[in-house]
């Protein structure tokens, strides 16, 4: 078995094109995609991965309300001083490829606040920031860019990447 983490969009295409025999995604296939699979398929629900706000600002313990999380992703909050850290420009990093991680992340952002304007999907029109391919690409940009913040699968929160805590509905700040 040779599994390649290429992102949900690329993985779906490879499965539909019959260049792979199986795949995994954070965003289940829709009927329109399933209809394109000529050989047939079985979709099996499984546990999803946790998504973290990963950041590179080692001197700051980041705690975001749900509204602040949305404002970071929209580029409204663009300086670390706006979330209680030292004055430093914040760089938003997002997935540039079609991604189940993006679909799950944007779904959360939409549930957090009515000010979320980008909708929900594997790809959205980010108003600012830098795109990178795959979780590994986003993690690479965050690791190599002081002040960067973005969304990644929790397994990428290591070394220079820290995880922000997010306030839940009951008011507690929790790590992913």
Each language-model region and where it sits:
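Exported/periplasmic ABC-transporter solute-binding proteins
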Residues: 1-176
């Amino acid at each position: 078995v040779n599994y390649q983490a290429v992102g949900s969009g690329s993985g779906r295409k490879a499965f539909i094109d019959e260049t792979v025999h199986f795949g995994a995604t954070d965003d289940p296939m829709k009927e329109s995609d399933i209809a394109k699979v000529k050989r047939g398929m079985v979709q099996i629900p499984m546990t999803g991965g946790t998504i973290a706000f990963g950041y590179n600002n080692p001197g700051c313990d980041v705690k975001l309300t749900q509204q602040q999380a949305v404002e970071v992703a929209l580029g409204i909050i663009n300086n670390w001083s706006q979330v209680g850290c030292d004055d430093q420009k914040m760089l938003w990093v997002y997935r540039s490829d079609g991604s189940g991680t993006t679909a799950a992340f944007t779904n959360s952002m939409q549930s957090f606040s009515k000010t979320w304007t980008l909708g929900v999907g594997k790809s959205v029109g980010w108003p600012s920031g830098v795109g990178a391919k795959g979780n590994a690409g986003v993690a690479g940009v965050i690791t190599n860019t002081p002040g960067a913040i973005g969304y990644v699968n929790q397994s990428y929160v290591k070394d220079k990447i820290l995880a922000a805590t997010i306030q839940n509905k009951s008011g507690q700040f929790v790590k992913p």
